[in-house]
Curated annotation (Swiss-Prot):
Segment forming the signal sequence: 1-22
Protein name, per record: RxLR effector protein PITG_15127
Coarse class of the protein's main subcellular location: secreted
Function: Effector that enhances P.infestans colonization of Nicotiana benthamiana leaves.
Comment field on protein domains: The RxLR-dEER motif acts to carry the protein into the host cell cytoplasm through binding to cell surface phosphatidylinositol-3-phosphate.
Organism of derivation: Phytophthora infestans (strain T30-4) (Potato late blight agent)
Residue span of motif RxLR-dEER: 48-63
Induction and repression of expression: Expression is induced during host plant infection.
Annotated family: Belongs to the RxLR effector family.
GO CC terms in record: extracellular region; host cell cytoplasm; host cell nucleus; host cell plasma membrane; membrane
Keywords: Host cell membrane, Host cytoplasm, Host membrane, Host nucleus, Membrane, Secreted, Signal, Virulence
Location in the cell: Secreted; Host cell membrane; Host nucleus; Host cytoplasm
Length: 516
């Protein structure tokens, strides 16, 4: 599976045939970097580029170069037919001044779209006809001036955009063959293309397809085990680093398809070739560094590994959550997941997945809702705020226990009441929390606090049982109005107001609206 938006350059056979033809035009024996006029040998004397002058000064040399290049440009535009260039130009032409004279130094994209490109090809063709030694090449000049990566990127981009296909493909072929003739390894080309500096976006770069084409060319010409996965693994610094790159690339629509394919290939190698086990990958991906690793992108990679590992080993009971719980413990993991605040949807989905796995493990282990209440360490202070993720976690586990979403007022009230020690204790704690908020100047929070919410839920249950306000002391607090505590009296007073409000007959709108 490939992400590339363009077709593969061509088959290797076509490539070899076309390049043998293209070499007559572009030449492919030029060294990676052509010497420029400022390059001085050790004896500090500049090389002669033009034979029409024998001056020894630097200024004279440059004047000769300029004059020769002007003549060169005119001849190239005229077709350079039947002209003996060997009489006035050297066998080692500099890339910079030549490209400048042909006005091809304003960027590789502009150069490919310029009509002067054809003139340059004509010049190089005639030059190579007269020069039987070190042949010049258009692609060599471009790579010397712009760099291998910029040239490769521009050529592939132009091909995808439907540029002059004959010229573009000829130059692409020439670049690949140039690397091959210089014995560049696929790792060398990865470096030349500067893919590592692109990070995960390298997977969406046109240069990635160039690298893939070169790998196929190398495989076709010699026995090798090179592959895109192997090259990227080494290029990005190892399997762990590549896994991190791929985990990030999965989140971007531009790179997701190729990232998933490469990730699958990498995991398949771990499982079927390297025979690694979950504990090895857990450490390899550095998920053992601390609880913050729960939100690491590589958790996705680890989860994919476990799925493939379990498929290959049916007796395996490895799970994502078990690895974290084994190291950090149930409480620490549950707390970390409860208070996690992901910045993106992908990480939020990861937290939800891990929580669900933990809930299922608790259910399989017979863990009660009351045990989870204690595990989450829910206490008085948790009633003071408008929201608290501990209650969300408890609610999520209750839903798992029932295999459906319980009505919040039923399942949660029962679980929280039991957690606090019964309805009477929950009533006292909610009353205490409300008084605490009012006494400390947070009356505005009182009406929206968790304490107020659960107090009203208790009142709703008592009203449904047809419990009268006068009966609260005996049925709930097992006391009397005379012996009740201040918090019990405050609760009874509030329930009395609630009872009256709900016992009052509904108001009937007696207003008469005249017809219009």
């Amino acid at each position: 599976m490939r992400l590339y938006s363009g077709a593969i350059l061509c088959t290797i056979a076509t490539l070899l045939i076309s390049v043998s033809t293209a070499s007559k035009t572009t030449g492919s024996h030029l060294s990676t970097r052509l010497p420029l006029p400022i390059d001085k040998p050790e004896n500090n004397s500049l090389p002669r580029f033009l034979r029409v002058s024998t001056q020894n000064t630097e200024n004279g040399e440059n004047r000769v170069i300029s004059a020769g290049l002007e003549k060169l440009t005119d001849l190239a535009k005229a077709g350079v037919s039947n002209i003996n260039l060997g009489s006035w130009i050297s066998k080692d032409p500099p890339a910079e001044p030549i490209l400048r004279r042909f006005k091809l130094t304003n960027g590789m994209d502009d150069a490919l779209a310029s009509p002067n490109l054809k003139a340059l090809e004509n010049y190089v063709k005639e030059l190579n006809t007269q020069n039987n030694n070190n042949k010049a090449s258009v692609i060599g000049m471009f790579m010397a001036h712009y760099g291998d990566d910029a040239v490769a990127n521009a050529l592939m981009t132009a091909q995808r955009a439907g540029g002059e296909m004959n010229t573009i493909q000829r130059l692409r072929n020439a670049q690949l063959l140039s690397w091959l003739q210089k014995r560049k390894s696929v790792d060398d080309v990865f470096t030349l293309l500067k893919l590592r500096s692109d990070g995960y976006l390298a997977l969406a770069s046109p240069k990635m397809e160039v690298l893939d084409d070169y790998i196929k060319l190398v495989i076709s010409t010699k026995s090798t085990k090179d592959s895109l996965l192997k090259t990227l693994t080494k290029g990005f610094g190892g399997k762990e680093q590549l896994a991190t790159i791929l985990a990030r690339a999965r989140e971007d629509v531009k790179t997701r398809e190729l990232a998933l394919a490469l990730q699958s290939a990498l995991i398949n190698k771990w499982v079927r070739v390297d025979l690694l086990r979950p504990k090895h990958i857990y450490k390899k991906l550095r998920l053992n560094r601390g609880l913050d690793a729960l939100l690491d992108r590589n958790v996705h990679t680890f989860g994919a590994f476990i799925s493939m590992y379990n498929a290959k080993n049916p007796n395996s009971k490895a799970s994502l959550i078990d690895s974290f719980v084994a190291q950090y413990g149930n409480k620490a993991v549950a707390t970390a997941l409860t208070f996690a605040k992901p910045d993106d949807a992908a990480t939020m989905n990861l937290v939800i997945t891990l929580q669900r796995q933990q809930f299922l493990k608790w259910k399989e282990g017979g863990i009660s809702a009351n045990s989870v209440f204690r595990l989450l360490d829910i206490h008085f202070n948790d009633l003071l705020s408008p929201t608290n993720p501990k209650f969300d976690t408890l609610s999520g586990y209750l839903a798992t226990l029932s295999n459906k979403n319980l009505l919040y007022n039923e399942g949660m009230l029962r679980a929280v009441s039991k957690g606090f020690g019964g309805e009477d204790e929950l009533a006292i704690q909610t009353a205490r929390a409300r008084e605490h908020l009012i006494r400390n100047g947070y009356a505005d929070l009182d009406e929206i606090s968790i304490a107020t919410e659960y107090q009203r839920m208790l009142f709703g249950r008592w009203f449904k049982r047809k419990t009268k306000p006068s009966d609260i002391y005996g049925t709930t607090f097992r006391s009397s109005e005379n012996t009740a505590s201040n918090l019990e009296r405050a609760t009874a007073a509030r329930y009395k107001d609630y009872y009256k409000e709900h016992m009052a007959p509904p108001r009937i709108d007696t207003s008469i609206n005249p017809r219009r």
